[in-house]
Amino acid sequence: MLSWRLQTGPEKAELQELNARLYDYVCRVRELERENLLLEEELRGRRGREGLWAEGQARCAEEARSLRQQLDELSWATALAEGERDALRRELRELQRLDAEERAARGRLDAELGAQQRELQEALGARAALEALLGRLQAERRGLDAAHERDVRELRARAASLTMHFRARATGPAAPPPRLREVHDSYALLVAESWRETVQLYEDEVRELEEALRRGQESRLQAEEETRLCAQEAEALRREALGLEQLRARLEDALLRMREEYGIQAEERQRVIDCLEDEKATLTLAMADWLRDYQDLLQVKTGLSLEVATYRALLEGESNPEIVIWAEHVENMPSEFRNKSYHYTDSLLQRENERNLFSRQKAPLASFNHSSALYSNLSGHRGSQTGTSIGGDARRGFLGSGYSSSATTQQENSYGKAVSSQTNVRTFSPTYGLLRNTEAQVKTFPDRPKAGDTREVPVYIGEDSTIARESYRDRRDKVAAGASESTRSNERTVILGKKTEVKATREQERNRPETIRTKPEEKMFDSKEKASEERNLRWEELTKLDKEARQRESQQMKEKAKEKDSPKEKSVREREVPISLEVSQDRRAEVSPKGLQTPVKDAGGGTGREAEARELRFRLGTSDATGSLQGDSMTETVAENIVTSILKQFTQSPETEASADSFPDTKVTYVDRKELPGERKTKTEIVVESKLTEDVDVSDEAGLDYLLSKDIKEVGLKGKSAEQMIGDIINLGLKGREGRAKVVNVEIVEEPVSYVSGEKPEEFSVPFKVEEVEDVSPGPWGLVKEEEGYGESDVTFSVNQHRRTKQPQENTTHVEEVTEAGDSEGEQSYFVSTPDEHPGGHDRDDGSVYGQIHIEEESTIRYSWQDEIVQGTRRRTQKDGAVGEKVVKPLDVPAPSLEGDLGSTHWKEQARSGEFHAEPTVIEKEIKIPHEFHTSMKGISSKEPRQQLVEVIGQLEETLPERMREELSALTREGQGGPGSVSVDVKKVQGAGGSSVTLVAEVNVSQTVDADRLDLEELSKDEASEMEKAVESVVRESLSRQRSPAPGSPDEEGGAEAPAAGIRFRRWATRELYIPSGESEVAGGASHSSGQRTPQGPVSATVEVSSPTGFAQSQVLEDVSQAARHIKLGPSEVWRTERMSYEGPTAEVVEVSAGGDLSQAASPTGASRSVRHVTLGPGQSPLSREVIFLGPAPACPEAWGSPEPGPAESSADMDGSGRHSTFGCRQFHAEKEIIFQGPISAAGKVGDYFATEESVGTQTSVRQLQLGPKEGFSGQIQFTAPLSDKVELGVIGDSVHMEGLPGSSTSIRHISIGPQRHQTTQQIVYHGLVPQLGESGDSESTVHGEGSADVHQATHSHTSGRQTVMTEKSTFQSVVSESPQEDSAEDTSGAEMTSGVSRSFRHIRLGPTETETSEHIAIRGPVSRTFVLAGSADSPELGKLADSSRTLRHIAPGPKETSFTFQMDVSNVEAIRSRTQEAGALGVSDRGSWRDADSRNDQAVGVSFKASAGEGDQAHREQGKEQAMFDKKVQLQRMVDQRSVISDEKKVALLYLDNEEEENDGHWF
């Protein structure tokens, strides 16, 4: 029991433990299941979210697509709306125009109506007056009638009373007394007469009034009618306008409908097109598969047929003992007998071969009978001079199709079929050419019918167009080696020659080649079906080259390209037909032809191919283990010709096969042949090229017409009278072509022909001269190049579209090329090559020197000179382009290019040594002249360089325009040119080593055209001669007053003449390079403009002035004499230049100063100026000062320059006007300044802006043009002297303020430039003793001016952005008589004008860099009248003292508007690119207003200029101080953006007169 308990106790514990573990496991499993459920829920949720995100993405994409579609629709709708808007705008403009017209018409009618109404009112008033007069007259008449009646009654009463009284007294009636009766009667008559007259008068007046009334009524009715008609017309016009509006609406609706319909149609057609494209692609794939299968089958079939046919032909040819026997027999036969008897032998052998073959039912050899063994041996070597190929004599009959003369289509297609199956046999009757003046006899053997066979075999021979028989030995030595090709562009090679008899000897053949004319052979086909069938078969055979053959062909083409002897040889298009020959004979024969190596000239077509004539080596090797039988080369040639006849079928292009009238001659020439040895067999690869050749006799015009009517690529001319033939061909080719542009390229190059074999001694030809006939007119394109070797002239005509480049030959030749052309279709070239003496050890890479004058029609000439000694020099010529210059530079010669107005070329030539040191540079300039110009090139190349230019250009002067004649006039005279001319000094300089010769052409240019000063030229064109006289007088006067000699002659002109006694003017040409040796790259980069090369240095005209007191050098541009001096300081390349020029009232001067940057300067008219240009160190950082003074008359200014480098200041007792323009690396600044003195109405135009001022007094126009990345046109300042009450100043800027004051002129101007818009300009003018207060304020400037009688204070505050950058306070402590001041700062700057004693304190803060500049300027001296304009200059400060009363300080602002910053260090000076450069300084005064008496005023100027150093935008610290005493200083410096200059040439002219001046006694002017 106990034991059981003991035993069961542990088991129970184990079971409990197991249960506990099981419970834990189950709990763990349940937890994991819950976790799995949670994870699955989360995964499902995430998948749902991903699905939602994908749906959202799809929704977004769909929305984007819909939005894009909406955008497209909206764009279309916008375009439609814009179109409708434009239509409505046009309609509105039309309606407005019509409305204006109607209003004008209505206004005219209203005016007429008013006039009529006024006339009506006047008529009515006159009528009323007349009615009133009528009433008065009637009343008067009634009164008169009443008085008359009363008087009558009274008289009657009195009479009655008297009668009664008498009757009463007397017994009877008594008669009145006679006196009373007379009175009564007379009174009655008088009254009756007056009454009648009165009544008549009244009736006339009434009649006139009625007539006037009637006229008035008629005019009123007419006016009413006209009014009614005008109303009707206006209504009709309104109706018409309404109808047009409705019509326009209908048309627009119709347009919209048509657009929709067309859109629908276009969509439908696009769908149809897409369907057709799909169908086409499917058909293309199907056709490609079919053609690929068919090609594979054809390749297999062709390979088998070709191999079998070749083997059979070779075996038959070698197994026929008659060939070997005949070959041995014919070697011992005389040449003449053999030539006459070979026809019958060939025919007999041909028939026997055919009989043997037919009996054995093999492929007939007759299919290759045109290259049978006998005929090939006899005729294969003939005509090697003209490039006849082996065995190609009898192939002319079937040139186009390449068929055998007696083979049928079935035979060619199936090489090995039985003859009995050939029932459809066609015979070919070729037409043979006429062989003139040759001993060759052409026989056509009649066809002989054979028993049991229906075929007719016409055997014909002698169609070879170049039968030039030689002796047998010569034929063995000279296997035909002509390489030519019949290309798809129908290239022809026509052999031209004289009619000479052909002898059998080799020397006679070479010296007297024959001419044979061959007509094109005609082919006759039985039916069109068979013709097309033959073409198809030919095409099938042409497509039988497999991929391996094409790969081998490309590989061999590459290898041959490497093996070319000279760069002039290019390979023609070739076809390689791989042929595997397995011959069981151990015979290795080698034929090494040594024919004439005739280089075939470039055909020059669009493909640019060159034919290549090389020495050909033919090798037909067979290797077998059997015997070692040695045969001669004739038997080898049999096999060669058999293979050639087979390969001939593959060398025809489909175009030539399809043509019915094909070329008469096809030559198949072996180009390369390789033997690839293999196991038990040898593969022979033969590369074949073919060419069509036709011989035409050009001795008569019929043959020449035939030649010129064909599309000929290359013409070879044989004969000694080659140059005569050229003229005939050109003249004949020009008949009937006068209406078109004609160009004939004639290139005649005579040079020895080199022989590869080297067996014969070299002969050299003599220099050859060709003189062109005077009346030869330009003709069609052709190129004649003549080569002479061993007394043989071979002139090749080539119709080309490109200029020929002379390739290196055996000897260095100098070629003069004269090109003449009509329109831009082409040109006429004459290459005249004159070989040098022929040294024996020349390489092939020597070269030639080209001097070219290309004459074309549009009055320009293009002349260039080039040597091609160094390999790799390439000539590129401007063809039919714009007139200009182009520098052609080889890639491998880093020679600097020099470019003047005419161009100068420096070259070195070393011709007789193996090393070549050349720097070829070509400058070409075009001058087109009429094509009637003809020049004789005879002997030109043997003369001096100047003579060559003189002879050519001397004939051009009458046909050139006047300006071009002036430019070229210096080339035709030897003497020194005066001002305004061109002088050229062409001379040869022998090098130090003696092995090189340098030709130096120095060109003196005196006429320049600057685009920026055309207006100045127009203004002062008439006074040029007066200006020249004034300049010369000024220079002489100034030289006579110089008392101290110059420090020395300039470095640029080392070794110049010493000063001589007296003053003399001598003009000489020079070339000044202002770029130090270490700075050529920097300067080149700085002065490089896009698209053209800039010169390394300028070409300037120089006047050397020698006097006892010193030596000066003057450069002349535009007829201004100048004196120049260069001071070179120390090894650190510190140099300075000083300039002074003297001008008359209207002089023009262009100055170009090229230092580290290239600058140009132009002076205002009537100004004297002096320029000091100081450059420190190799960094070429310029320091410039500029002062410009205007005076009424020129006198003798003198300038004194400090010898040490540093900032320079200048002062003078004159008013100044200047322009200072500088450009850095990124932007350019150009100012234009025109100064007029006197009553001138002037207009100055610069760039795209135009300004005009009109006034009675002095006028000044300053134009500032900034060409930079940020700023555009900066502003224009126009200033008029206060000679009138009101001054108008117009500026092209943002805002203009003008004020007119009664006693003075005040102008306050604000100019904003660029994105920052913080440019401020103020002008405060004090006029007389009247105090004026001018105040103007805008968003960025504040000006306060206070004036009193004696003290004036002005405070200027310049605001830039959010910062005050300049504060000024100026106190004027004396009476200012008249001193207008204008302060125009393109950057922030200020100016003070003082009169008497002035004190000026200025504190300037420049931007965030806190650069401060403090100045204290004290000036003493009276002033009469001063104008001051101040603007910030670039790097240096520009100081002016006019009448010792004014000073200008220019401070460059902070980094926002850095004008020009530079770093200056003693050891390293480098330029920092600047962002903006806007500066202008202008000073104007009236004549005589600045004159000072003999008194001279002390002038002391203290300058302290500080700038904090920083990054590229912060100015480097510079401190300079200079105190100078100046009597006169005139300076002008200008830099022009190269992109704004029209002409390509950059010119530099420096004019200075440097002498340490002394005190002057009298007036200056």
UniProtKB/Swiss-Prot annotation:
Keywords from the named record: Cell junction, Coiled coil, Cytoplasm, Cytoskeleton, Intermediate filament, Methylation, Phosphoprotein
Phosphothreonine: residues carrying this PTM: T598, T651
Residue ranges constituting the IF rod domain according to the UniProt record: 11-322
Keyword NADP appears in the UniProt entry: no
Region (Tail): 301-1565
Feature: compositional bias, Basic and acidic residues: 498-577, 1019-1040, 1513-1525
Compartmental location: Cytoplasm, Cytoskeleton; Cell junction, Adherens junction
Region called Linker 12, residue ranges: 164-186
Positions of the UniProt region annotated as Linker 1: 50-58
GO biological process: fast-twitch skeletal muscle fiber contraction; intermediate filament cytoskeleton organization
Protein name: Synemin
Gene: SYNM
